[in-house]
Amino acid sequence: MNYTKNLLSTLALLFMSTSAINAGNISVNAARTVANNFVKQHAAAAPGTLRGTASSDLMLAHAEPSSVVTNANDYYAFNIKGGGFVIIAGEDRAAQVLGYSDKGRIDFNNLPAPLEDLLNGYKKEIEFLQTYKGNDLVPAPVTFKASNGVEPLIKTTWGQEDPYDWQCPVYQNQYCVVGCVATAMAQVMYYWQYPTSSNAIGRYYCYSIRQYVPALPATTFDYSLMIDSYCHWDWDNSQLVQDFYTDPQAQEVAKLGRYCGQAVEMDYSPEGSGAYTDSQLAAMKSFGYSSSAQYVQKGYSWNNNYTTAQWESMIRTELDAGRPILYAANDPSAGGHAFICDGYNSENRYHFNFGWYGTCDGWYVSTALNMTHREGDELKFNSGHEMLIGVEPPAYCIINAENLNVASGLMVLGDQLSAEAQNVTFRTTYNQLNVDFSLIDAEGNQVCSSDNITIGKNSFQQGSSINGSITLPTTLAEGSYSIGFYYYTTDASKQTKVQATQDKLQVVGHIAKYGEPFTISDVSVVIDYLLQGSSDILGIKDVTALIDYLLN
C-alpha cells in the first residue's frame, strides 16, 4: 500500500442523484456484445492472444453496481474461456473497454489491491458521467495513435509473500509482507540489474508493529541468482503455488525487497505493508539512480495541472526510452497502491504489472473519461495517479541474447570454434560496446576469447546476430568448458557475462568436441575426422602412430 499525504477531494457536482436513470447506461447484454466484438477483433488480428470466438466463451465475473444511480452498473468484467478477461464500462460515454488480459482470470474475491484502486478510480469517473446534468459533453478527440507501441518491459511476476518476505521483519511469529512500493522498486531494479551494491541503511520505528526495524549493513546484490517467477496463482484451486527455486535464489530476491522497503521506511505488517509513494524518489536516488528523476501527480484537487494528453505523452516518452515507470493509483477513502507501467499499445492502453504474482497484469486505460466539454476544455476529475519518470542508472549497459549457437563436431586443438549470439538487444548510455566469445573452465575462469567485436549504440540493428570464433589453444587442458558471450564498455578487464551455453566443449588429448561427451577410444570417429577430404590411405601402423601423436 502507498499512502497519500492529503485527503483527495471529489467534485461538488458528483452524486447529486441516486434515483435518476441515465440514458447512457449499458446493460449486461450490451456489455457482453461489446466484449465479444472486442475479443473477436483481437483474436483475428493477433491469433493466440484473446482466444474467445463466441458470446458463449464469455462468463460474467462481476457487475459493479452504481452507488449513484439505481438499476445501473459502473462496469462489467467477463472471463474468457481459455484464458484472459475483459472489463467493459457500464456507461456509453466512458471508454468502452477499460482493460483486458490474454491470460489468467479476474476474480473479485482475489483482486490485486492495485487493480482494485484502479477500478475504484474508473468507478468514480463513470459515476461522474452518470450524474452529469449538462448537455455540453462531446467525445474527446484522439490526440495520439501509436503505430506499434512498446511491449511489456518487465518480465518478472514477483509478489509480496513467500519467498519474497523471507528477510522482512517478523511480528507475532509471522513474516511481514514486502509491500507494494518495495515490490515495484525491486522489479524495476532487477530490470536494470542495478545497483550491484547498497550502502548501510539506518534503523527506524515502525508504528504498525510498534517496534524498531533494525539497521541493515552494506551489501551486494547478485541479480544472476534471481529468477523471473517464484510462484504463480493456481486458478483451478484458488491458491498460490510455489515454482521451483533454490534457497540462494529465494534469499537474494528477499534481500533486494527488504533493502527497497528499508529505503522507503516501510510501515511493515503481516497483513499489509505501506509507504508513501513519493518516498520512492529519494530511495531510488539513494541507490544511485539518475538525479534528474522526477515525481509527478495528476488528478488531485491541489495539483491537477496535467491534461490526459500531457500525462499519457509523458508515459510514452518514458516507455519509448526503455524506462519502466513506478506508478500508483489512489483511492480517496483507502489510500492507494504502487505498481509498474511498462508498455503501451496502438489502442492507447497501458500495460500494468501489479506485483501480484502476475495476477491480472494486462492492458488498461489511464482514465475512463472519454468526453470533453464542447468548448474543448477537458473534464477535471480527482482520480489521483502518480509516477516517477526519468528513473535509470547514471551509466548503464544491459545486453541480452536470445540464444547462443555453437558449431558442433570434432576439432583438433588449434582449430577455430565458431559461435553465434542470436537476437541481440541492448540498452546503454555508452556510444559503443565491445563484445566477444570466451571459453570458460569449470571454475568460471575465462581461458581464451575471440577477437573483440565493436557495436555502435546508434548503428547496431536491434535483434541482429553477432558471430565470432575462438581459436582453441594447442595447450588446452583436458576437461569440460562452456562458451560465454561477454561485453565490456571501455576496460577489457571488466567483462560482464551475458549468457553461457549449457552444453559443453569436451577436450580429450588433442581432440575437442562440442555437444555430447566422447572418449578417445571411439577410434573410428577420430579416423573419419582425420581422413575427411583426404585421398591418402593410411595403413594400420600409420593410423596407430597418428593416434599416438594426438594423445601425446
Please place each PLM-identified region on the residue numbering.
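Catalytic Cys-His active-site segments of thiol-dependent hydrolases/isopeptidases
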Residues: 89-90, 95-105, 347-367
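Solvent-exposed serine/threonine-rich low-complexity stretches and specific carbohydrate-binding patches
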Residues: 443-463, 468
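Active-site-adjacent structural segments surrounding the nucleophilic cysteine of cysteine proteases
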Residues: 94-274, 507
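Active-site-adjacent substructure of cysteine-protease-like catalytic cores
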Residues: 58-82, 287-353
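Short beta-strand elements
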Residues: 491-511
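Short, compositionally biased P/S/T/A/G/V-rich stretches that sit at domain boundaries
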Residues: 375-423, 445, 507
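Short, non-transmembrane alpha-helical segments in secretory-pathway proteins
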Residues: 24-69
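Alpha-helical segments with a strong preference for the paired helices of cellulosomal dockerin domains
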Residues: 186, 511-552
